[in-house]
């Protein structure tokens, strides 16, 4: 399972990287097109579950979400048209980048 967050408010990602088991809050300018993800503070109950079960915590820039929003809106072949805002598109943007970006090759390694 992957948790994808806006890089401007990536509290869960920073908490995972810190490896202390505690939540790290993000403050300051939380400006992002992913408005629904711009809170900067995690929930302790959720964090207690996520920190032990998530495979990847991803800090995602706005372009990743914008690209996925366009992919959803312009499906290929028989794929369905999906209407999604930027907060809902970011997981697809992360997956697309992991599969197609040479710099993200390490994300494809199997455990």
Per-segment meaning from a language model:
Residues 1-111:
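PLP-dependent amino-acid enzyme catalytic core
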């Amino acid at each position: 399972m992957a948790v994808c967050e806006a890089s401007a408010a990536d509290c869960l990602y920073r908490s995972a990287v810190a490896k202390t088991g505690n939540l790290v809050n993000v403050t300051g300018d939380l400006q992002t097109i992913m408005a629904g993800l711009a809170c900067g503070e995690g929930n302790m109950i959720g964090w207690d579950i996520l920190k032990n079960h998530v495979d990847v915590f991803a800090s995602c820039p706005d372009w990743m979400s914008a690209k996925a929003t366009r992919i959803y809106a312009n499906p290929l072949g028989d794929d369905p048209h999906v209407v999604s805002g930027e907060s809902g598109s970011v997981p697809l943007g992360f997956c697309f980048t992991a599969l197609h970006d040479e710099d993200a090759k390490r994300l494809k390694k199997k455990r």
